[in-house]
């Protein structure tokens, strides 16, 4: 979020042709401590400059005291965490003067002390803060496989009508120390058949929603990426007007 440089040059050119979606990874919405107000103010300047169609952050934490951990870490889903997350989202939305979208996480462990399941927790956050939802379909699938949850029950518990953006991605596979299959939200593979299937099912409830395909590692040729984009667009076209 620097003031100048090549990133801004290219963003300004992109803004001439496309609406932007700005996606944050460093707000640490779930942290026990206070939000970084300097980070929040820099973000406010960035959003004022580009006026994106949407801004989103993750349901996760990445800070503890003065330490920044370069990862999106899971939360214990209890009343105290719910209150804290809602307070932080209220602070973000009040500072930015806009609605924030909250992305569901991909997780690899659960806390025994949690008193909410994940989709119920997300639903309560959305209800209390008025934030929207960024529904990451790959994260839904990864978490449900890793924790042996039902994808159907998970989706049914979410406020799908509040979905304002959708992410699709591929995952990688590993095994834990007990030999159990473990999915990793690596963004390093094509969108899997199971993700496409869930995406079509979700669109039946949401209608056409702005969709992003994420690919960070093991990048294929451009033709492969464009083919995935065309596939997503075809599903969107089947469910109404292009977003």
Mark where each language-model region is.
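Gly/Pro-rich active-site loop or hairpin
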Residues: 2-4, 34, 72-76, 82, ...
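Hydrophobic faces of well-ordered beta-strands that scaffold small-molecule active sites
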Residues: 18-23, 53-57, 100-103, 133-135, ...
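Acidic/histidine-rich catalytic cores of soluble enzymes
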Residues: 93, 98-178
């Amino acid at each position: 979020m620097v003031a100048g440089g090549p990133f801004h040059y290219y963003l300004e050119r992109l803004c001439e042709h496309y609406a932007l979606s700005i996606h944050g990874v460093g707000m640490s919405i779930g942290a026990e401590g206070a939000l970084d107000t300097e980070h929040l103010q820099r973000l406010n300047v960035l959003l004022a400059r580009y006026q994106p169609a949407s801004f989103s952050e993750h349901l996760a934490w990445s800070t503890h005291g003065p330490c920044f951990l370069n990862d999106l870490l899971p939360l214990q889903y209890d009343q105290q965490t719910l209150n804290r997350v809602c307070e932080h989202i209220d602070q973000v939305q009040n500072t930015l003067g806009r609605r924030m979208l909250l992305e569901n996480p991909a997780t690899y462990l659960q806390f025994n002390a949690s008193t909410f399941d994940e989709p119920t927790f997300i639903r309560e956050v959305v209800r209390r803060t008025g934030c929207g939802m960024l529904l990451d379909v790959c994260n839904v699938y990864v978490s449900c496989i890793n924790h042996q949850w039902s994808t159907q029950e998970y989706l049914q518990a979410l406020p799908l009508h509040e979905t304002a953006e959708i992410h699709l991605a591929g995952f990688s596979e590993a095994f834990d120390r007990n030999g159990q299959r473990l999915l990793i939200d690596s963004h390093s593979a094509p969108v899997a058949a199971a993700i496409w299937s869930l995406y079509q099912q979700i669109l039946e409830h949401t209608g056409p929603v702005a969709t992003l395909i994420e690919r960070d590692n093991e990048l294929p040729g451009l033709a492969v990426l464009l083919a995935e984009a065309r596939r997503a667009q075809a599903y969107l076209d089947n469910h109404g007007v292009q977003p």
